[in-house]
A protein has these predicted regions:
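Hydrophobic structural segments characteristic of membrane proteins
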Residues: 1-18, 66, 134-166
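Short, solvent-exposed cationic patches
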Residues: 98-115
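A hydrophobic, helix-centered structural microdomain
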Residues: 23-93, 165
Length: 166
């Protein structure tokens, strides 16, 4: 093996190491990050409580159903938790999914259509403005999520991600 091949091999190994083994956090980092999450999510919940109230009333008035939708997700440590969102679809959205599968515009496990008839009028607005995500502040306060970090995976899609990686 010549010098150039050796250098290239070492560079590739270094890249793989950085990808698979992130650097260890400095002492106190996890504590500081958690403290930041608690303070910021608590303040946001207090400040945004009028928005929570208004959206809750609007969703309830539209169709009388549950205001909060939850789905099972995984924490960074692989523990399951319920992730909360404001409900943006009709109450029987899951039952209607099978009849809409032929309209799916995505390849793979995700389902998406441009004009999903299951999305309510209030739902369109709260999705467009990302207000539907605000209840996740409760997940952050509970320690299931963090303000800074990747979006938690849906448990039902986890096997599909594992297949794609291997």
């Amino acid at each position: 093996m010549n010098l150039m091949q050796t250098a290239e091999k070492q560079a590739n190994a270094a890249q793989e190491t950085r990808f698979f083994a992130p650097p260890k956090a400095k002492p106190g980092y996890e504590f500081a990050k958690r403290a930041f999450d608690i303070v910021m999510s608590f303040l946001a919940l207090v400040i945004l409580s009028p928005v929570f109230l208004a959206v809750s009333i609007a969703i309830h008035l539209e169709d009388g159903g549950n205001v909060i939708y939850s789905s099972i997700r995984l924490t960074k440590n692989g523990k399951e938790f319920k992730m909360y969102k404001f409900r943006s679809m009709c109450m029987d959205a899951e039952q209607k999914l099978d009849s809409l599968m032929s309209l799916n515009e995505m390849n793979g496990p995700a389902f998406k259509i441009a004009e999903d008839p299951r999305i309510t009028k209030v739902g369109k607005f709260i999705r467009k403005t990302s207000i539907d995500e605000l209840p996740q502040l409760v997940n952050i306060l509970k320690g299931d999520m963090s303000i800074v970090g990747p979006r938690p995976l849906l448990v039902k899609y986890l096997p599909l991600y594992n297949e794609a990686v291997t």
